[in-house]
Amino acid sequence: LDPLFATIQKEFLEEQTKLFGTDHIYGADPFNEVAPPSWEPEFLANCSKHIYQSMTHVDPDATWLQMTWLFYIDRHLWTNERVEAFLKAVPQDKLLLLDYYCENTEVWKQTDRYFGQPYLWCYLGNFGGNTMLAGNTKEVGKRIENVYTNGGENFSGLGSTLEGFDVNPFMYEYVFSKAWDCNLPDSVWIEQLADRRIGLKNQQMRRAWKLLYDSIYTVPAALGQGTLMNARPCLKGNGNWTTTPTVAYSNETLFEVWEMLLKAGEHRHSAYEYDVVNIGRQ
């Protein structure tokens, strides 16, 4: 390993701590969509061992935060033998893993629950800051309930790994509500959500959100999903993969939702106004 790595990391973390203090959690994502120089388990173990040790030179209480996208995107290369060697070279409970894309693939299931290291079940839900209405709500709920039951003692909570903020807030509110009450039926949660967003009990609002839940939020977000209004101009088609304008629902159904929201009445609750504008623009 390059001896400068530990030196540079030490100086960086020291300066960062001077500026911001520390919560003793440090993010490092080696080999993210990059192949290591060697795939030998011993080499991979040596890498992770030295990454963590260089953190402890600055903070003896350091915990390493690592996303596990690499185990998903290069799964054919990251065999369980290699994953185990990489993870177990760090002291137990000093590595916190983000299972990055669980609405699509739950890596914890493929890696014997990360061989005992703590991990968070994470909902990605957003590539590149797109603002489409998308999310496989019911499947996400089932997967969260399952990880609570079968995720092992090292399952440490829920997280989110979205690639853009202020987008599609419904799915993230849904996911994080499960951290507080995983057993609350979705039918009850949807009604409570509708009431909160308008500031009172309103049947039109409840029906609108029930229809969104049943008919709109049914499939996960796609890579490059976005409207043609946001696409680069072209004479034919949609240009390239970065803008995929297809949607998995009927716009007539979405228009019906919008009508219900508008019929809910004159309310100045900011969340309700957001919903009216958000559904309308879509």
Predicted region positions:
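Catalytic-core regions of glycoside hydrolase
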Residues: 1-213, 218-222, 238-243, 247-251
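Histidine-centered catalytic/metal-binding microenvironments
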Residues: 229, 234-282
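Ligand-binding clefts/hinges and TM-proximal coupling segments of bilobed small-molecule sensing domains
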Residues: 224-228
